[in-house]
Structure formats: C-alpha cells, structure tokens
Amino acid sequence: MIKRAIISTYRRFLHFVIFMMMCNVVIGQDLHFSQFYEAPLLRNPALAGLYEGDVRIQGVYRNQWNSVAFPYQTGSINAEYKFPVGKGEDFLTVGGQVLYDKAGTVQLQTVHMLPMVNFHKSLSTNKVSYLSLGFMGGMVNRRLDRSRVTTNSQYDGFYFNGSLPDGETFTGAYSYADMSVGMSFNTTLGSNDQHYVFWGLAYHHFNKPMHSFYGNIAHLPKWVASGGLKLNLDDVTYITFHGDITDQKPFREIMGGGTFSKRLGDEYASTTTVHAGCTPGTT
C-alpha cells in the first residue's frame, strides 16, 4: 500500500516538473510544424498573398504522444484575401492566423488570434516583382486546469494528499498582446517568367510580452529568415523548395523542405493539384 502511494506521488510530482518546464524553461521555442510552409503567416506576415488567385485558406493539424493519457494537439488555420490598391499593380492582402495548442495532464491550452495586413509594392511593369511589408498582431490566451496541478507541497510525508494546498500563487489563465513584422521580396525568373523565387525576414514578438503564469518572464523575440523557389518542369508539373532559419535565443533551427506537385485534368481548366513532399531539419 505504501509502495503504491509512493509511486503515485512520484508520478504526480513528475507531471508537475514537466508542467513547470513547459511554463518556464521551454519558453524560447514557439509552436511550429514539420510542414512549416503550410503555415506561411507563422513564418513571416509578409509572405501573405504570395499565391495564385484572390483567396487562400490553409489548415494544419498535429497530434503527438497518442500513447499518453493527454496527447499534445496543435492546429493552425490562416485565411487571406488580396485586392488591388491604387492605379498601378500594387495590392493589399488582409487576413488572419488562428493557432491552437493543448498539451499535458494539466490541459495547458494556448489560443492565438492574430489579424494581419500586408502591402505589396510592384517593382516592375514587365514581370511579377514585388516588395512586401507585413504586420500581424493580436491576442494570445493561455490557460490550464488548476485542479489538475499537483506539487510536492501536497505530499504529507507518507502519500499524496489532494486536500492540501499546492503552495502555488499563479492564476489559471492570462492573456497578452503579440506582434510581428516582416518584409519579403518575390519575383519571376526564366526566359518566359516560368519560375518563381521569394525570400524574406521577419521579427516576431517585438513587443516582448510577458509569457508566464507568474507574469515575470518576457517572450523572447524571434528572427526568421525564409526563402522559396518554384521550378515549373512543364505546364502541369512543378517542384517547390522552402527553407527557414529561425533564431530565438538560445535556440536556432534550420528547416528545409520541398514538394512535387502535379495539376490534374486539363492544364488550363484544372483546379485540383496533388502535392507530395518532405521536410528535413535540424535544431
């Protein structure tokens, strides 16, 4: 009986340690996806609007650690709409990013609601060539189930006692404003302008919001350098390469990826494209 109680206490204490690491130590790493290129606004708000057509809606979902009682779930949805401004080839993209994350025994939840705007200045009348300046900012809410938090203060010397106070003073939820800014350049390449390249630089969390349930830890700013190259192999087939270098002290991450894409049906009337790709990276 005593041995079982000790094991139970150890497990609860281990959960608390993991929770504290999530709240305080791993603050330097933002949420991100292996297929990072499917969440462009998380890379750089100035990458909004870099697509064919007027509207783009993207969704990404990640589910980790399914073997545990409370798996880690992360989802992202971004929507963009672009329209011309002025008399030239300039245009504006407006939209937003919604990011949701849920993790751990204490059901730690994070919700980002981030509207964005991106202005694209045309640099040429002979080809597609734009310099873009984007801004994204909104609110982030973080919360947890306070009743699930357990600490060593609830160990009475023999076993875990949930009726004892946990000795912690933090609240179960808080919100903060988060802001990002970025620039990008994109242009067509080749004798027939059949290829496409872009690169950009973004500065995230430049307002350094407080990012802790204790209200005493500033969110570390993050730099992201991005690049991409689209090569058309023929009228219906193309390859796209993406790369990011992320620096958020003390972490640095380099990710690269690519997709092979093929339009289905008639090359001029097709609205369906099949993609296959991979994403290696290093931290």
Range-by-range predicted roles:
Residues 1-38, 258:
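Bacterial Sec-dependent N-terminal signal peptides
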Residues 29-283:
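Subset of outer-membrane beta-barrel
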